[in-house]
């Protein structure tokens, strides 16, 4: 194979791997390595196929400046039409007991996916929002680069 063909092959593979299916939505918020305790990260989204169950996943990208092995969140979910709210307090593990990050990634940044709600059926089509607040002791939580929300349709 010539170098030109190999380059084209890598380009096609990269494009295929970087595409999200239409049944998946991902939104990330950049925190620049510091997450203020008073700052809620809000994710607004529309559900057009409430009949299909969804997995709601919280995405965390941390670096080696993160001083803890776990992370705690307060999650506020709101139905935009009815204004009905639910609040969850969550605790997730970011590191093994030996201090090794469990997330995947190259270099200092690791990405970890945390299951928030699995096989969740939204009550109806419409607009929703999920707000995430860090609930750690530190007012300025260092080492969190990005926080995100991934919503995927459950495959039958």
Can you describe what each PLM-predicted range is?
Residues 16-18:
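C-terminal motif of bacterial Sec signal peptides marking the signal peptidase cleavage site
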Residues 41-68:
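Post-signal-peptide N-terminal segment of Sec-exported extracytoplasmic proteins
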Residues 63-65, 111-112, 121, 134-142:
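Short acidic/polar inter-strand loop motif in beta-rich domains
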Residues 27-48:
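Post-signal peptide N-terminal segment of mature Sec-exported envelope proteins
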Residues 20-23:
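Bacterial signal peptide processing site
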Residues 90-121:
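An anionic, turn-rich surface loop/hairpin at beta-sheet edges
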Residues 51-58, 120-136:
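Noncatalytic modules at the cell exterior or secretory-pathway interfaces
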Residues 67-73, 143-146:
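Short coil-to-beta strand junction motifs in C2/discoidin
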């Amino acid at each position: 194979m010539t170098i030109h063909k190999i380059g084209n092959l890598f380009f096609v593979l990269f494009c295929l791997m970087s595409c999200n299916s239409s049944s998946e939505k991902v939104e990330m918020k950049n925190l620049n390595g510091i997450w203020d305790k008073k700052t809620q990260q809000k994710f607004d989204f529309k559900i057009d196929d409430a009949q299909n169950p969804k997995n709601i996943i919280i995405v965390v990208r941390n670096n080696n400046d993160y001083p803890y092995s776990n992370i705690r969140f307060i999650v506020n979910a709101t139905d935009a039409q009815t204004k009905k709210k639910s609040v969850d307090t969550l605790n997730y593990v970011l590191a093994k007991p030996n201090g090794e990050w469990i997330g995947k990634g190259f270099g200092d940044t690791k990405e970890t996916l945390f299951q928030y709600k699995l096989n969740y059926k939204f009550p109806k089509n419409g607009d929703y929002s999920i707000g995430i607040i860090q609930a750690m002791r530190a007012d300025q939580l260092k080492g969190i680069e990005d926080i995100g929300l991934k919503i995927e349709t459950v495959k039958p």
